[in-house]
Amino acid sequence: MRPAVQVALLGGSFNPPHVGHLMAATYVHATQDVDEVWLMPSWQHPFGKQMEPFEHRVAMCDALCAETSGWLKTSRIEQEPGLSGRTVDTLTLLVARHPDIRWSIIIGSDILRDLPHWKDFHRIEELSRVMVLNRAGYPAPNTLGPPLAEVSSTLIRDLLARGEAPSDLVPARAIAYAREHGLYGLKRTP
């Protein structure tokens, strides 16, 4: 019997969230028999990268979710006290809290090279279905779907630092939020 709800988790820094995240979530929702996709911004980056504050990244993810009909949601689970920022710990907590949900994890093929550094990846595979999406420039066997758009949060931050508008890479509501709050060096809007 199919579980009541099937949820795919798309974790990341979302610093900022962009159309690549939206396209990946939309692809999984449309083709992989999941009811919801949850964006899961990291509280702190497990490898120490600097990010905008969590609340701002959550708000920009919420703006991205507003582009959908309710199947895309933002999870604040990573702000839970005691979580390490490691996927296996977050997933273990989610499984304990929601045993009726069938969990999936979405990763891009660009992440495959980092898996040896992930804590207990074998446990992640036991707790969830791991979906590896085909990211352009990172060919790998057994990936799902066509290559994803070549867009990254790093590229967007670089464009913003040069004073260029990434309007075709970041949904309007998310970039408006960033501008309103002066994130990424953007001048605040009144």
Swiss-Prot record:
GO terms, biological process: NAD biosynthetic process
Protein's UniProt name: Probable nicotinate-nucleotide adenylyltransferase
UniProt xrefs under HAMAP family: NaMN_adenylyltr (MF_00244)
Uppermost EC category: transferase
EC number(s) on file: 2.7.7.18
A Pfam family this chain is assigned to: CTP_transf_like
UniProt record similarity statement: Belongs to the NadD family.
InterPro entries: Cyt_trans-like, NadD/NMNAT, Rossmann-like_a/b/a_fold
Recorded metabolic or biological pathway in which this protein acts: Cofactor biosynthesis; NAD(+) biosynthesis; deamido-NAD(+) from nicotinate D-ribonucleotide: step 1/1
Catalytic activity: nicotinate beta-D-ribonucleotide + ATP + H(+) = deamido-NAD(+) + diphosphate
A GO molecular-function annotation: nicotinate-nucleotide adenylyltransferase activity
Function: Catalyzes the reversible adenylation of nicotinate mononucleotide (NaMN) to nicotinic acid adenine dinucleotide (NaAD).
Keyword presence, Disulfide bond: no
Keyword set, alphabetical order: ATP-binding, NAD, Nucleotide-binding, Nucleotidyltransferase, Pyridine nucleotide biosynthesis, Transferase
